[in-house]
Amino acid sequence: MSLDTAEKQKLIENHQVHPTDTGSVEVQVAMLSKRISKLSDHLQGNIHDFASRQGLLKMIGKRKRLLSYLKDKNVQKYQELVKKIGIRG
């Protein structure tokens, strides 16, 4: 499940570190989280879509690695991002 341009732009604006930022860890995690939630909704109704399930697991793994990296580099930003996105507790 991909995001349309307007959704991507809104996520980038909400999570960017500076005006031209499109690839920081915060932006990447926000985009992955949105894609994960859309794909999870899709899988609720399409239980036997195993290809999408595999893609979901890959996205979850990538988000986990990015969050781990951010936590190692800057715990304060990590905590703010987790709270803002609403994941992990």
Curated annotation (Swiss-Prot):
InterPro entries: Ribosomal_uS15, Ribosomal_uS15_bac-type, uS15_NS1_RNA-bd_sf. Residues 1-18 have a biased composition (Basic and acidic residues). SUPFAM superfamilies: S15/NS1 RNA-binding domain (SSF47060). One of its GO terms (cellular component) is cytosolic small ribosomal subunit. It holds the Pfam family Ribosomal_S15. The keyword RNA-binding applies. Residues 1-23 are annotated as: Disordered. It comes from the Bacteria. Keywords: Ribonucleoprotein, Ribosomal protein, RNA-binding, rRNA-binding. The keyword Oxidoreductase does not apply. One of its GO terms (molecular function) is structural constituent of ribosome. GO terms for biological process: translation. Part of the 30S ribosomal subunit. Forms a bridge to the 50S subunit in the 70S ribosome, contacting the 23S rRNA. Belongs to the universal ribosomal protein uS15 family. One of the primary rRNA binding proteins, it binds directly to 16S rRNA where it helps nucleate assembly of the platform of the 30S subunit by binding and bridging several RNA helices of the 16S rRNA. Forms an intersubunit bridge (bridge B4) with the 23S rRNA of the 50S subunit in the ribosome. NCBIfam families: S15_bact. This is Small ribosomal subunit protein uS15. It comes from Prochlorococcus marinus (strain AS9601).
